[in-house]
C-alpha cells in the first residue's frame, strides 16, 4: 500500500479531529500529482490510499484525479479515497460509476447519526443525503464503500450508538 496525499488540511471543523487544527487547505500541483500517479500505475502498485482528509472538498481537483486514474487504469491498481458523500456532485457520481469494478473504493465518515452528537462535535453532515448517495453508488456494483462510525463521542451512549450502527447497516455498505 502506498499512502499518498494530494491535499492537506480539511474544510470542516469537527471538534474531535486533529485535522481541524490546521485551518488551511493546500492542494498539490495536479501535473505533479498525475506524474506521481502514473509512476504507481506503471509499477502496478496494488493499492494507493489517498490520505487527503476530504478528497472531494475541491470539485475540480477530485474530477481531474478521478478522470486521470480512469483513463490510465492498468487493471490492477486500486485507489482509496476518504470522501464526504453528502457533498459529492452528480458529475462526480457519474464519473466514478463508470469506472471498472475495483478501480476505486470510498471511505465515508458518518461518525454518528445522533443529531445531538453531530451538533456537539460540529460535524456538518446530511445523513439523508449520505444514504441517497451511497445507495446510488451501490447500484453500480463497481465501488467498494465503507462507512465509519466512532464510538464514545459526546452524547453517544450504547443505545444511540446501536441506532447509528443500525442506520448505517441498513444502507448496506460493503464494510461498516
Give residue ranges: language-model regions.
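Proline-aspartate-enriched helix->loop->beta-strand connector
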Residues: 45, 173-176
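Catalytic cores of alpha/beta
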Residues: 92-96, 154-170
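Radical SAM [4Fe-4S] cluster-binding motif and immediate context
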Residues: 1-139, 151
Amino acid at each position: 500500500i502506498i499512502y499518498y496525499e494530494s491535499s492537506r488540511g480539511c474544510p470542516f471543523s469537527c471538534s474531535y479531529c486533529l485535522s481541524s487544527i490546521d485551518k488551511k487547505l493546500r492542494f498539490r500541483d495536479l501535473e505533479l500529482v498525475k506524474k506521481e500517479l502514473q509512476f504507481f500505475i506503471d509499477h502496478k502498485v496494488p493499492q494507493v490510499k489517498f490520505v487527503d482528509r476530504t478528497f472531494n472538498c475541491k470539485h475540480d481537483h477530485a474530477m481531474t484525479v478521478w478522470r486521470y486514474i480512469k483513463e490510465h487504469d492498468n487493471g490492477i491498481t486500486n485507489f482509496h479515497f476518504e470522501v464526504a458523500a453528502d457533498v459529492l456532485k452528480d458529475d462526480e457520481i457519474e464519473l466514478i460509476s463508470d469506472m471498472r469494478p475495483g478501480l476505486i473504493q470510498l471511505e465515508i465518515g458518518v461518525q454518528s447519526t445522533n443529531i445531538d452528537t453531530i451538533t456537539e462535535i460540529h460535524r456538518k453532515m446530511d445523513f439523508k443525503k449520505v444514504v441517497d448517495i451511497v445507495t446510488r453508488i451501490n447500484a453500480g456494483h463497481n465501488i467498494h464503500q465503507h462507512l465509519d462510525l466512532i464510538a464514545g463521542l459526546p452524547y453517544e451512549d450504547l443505545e444511540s450508538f446501536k441506532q447509528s450502527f443500525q442506520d448505517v447497516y441498513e444502507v448496506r455498505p460493503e464494510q461498516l
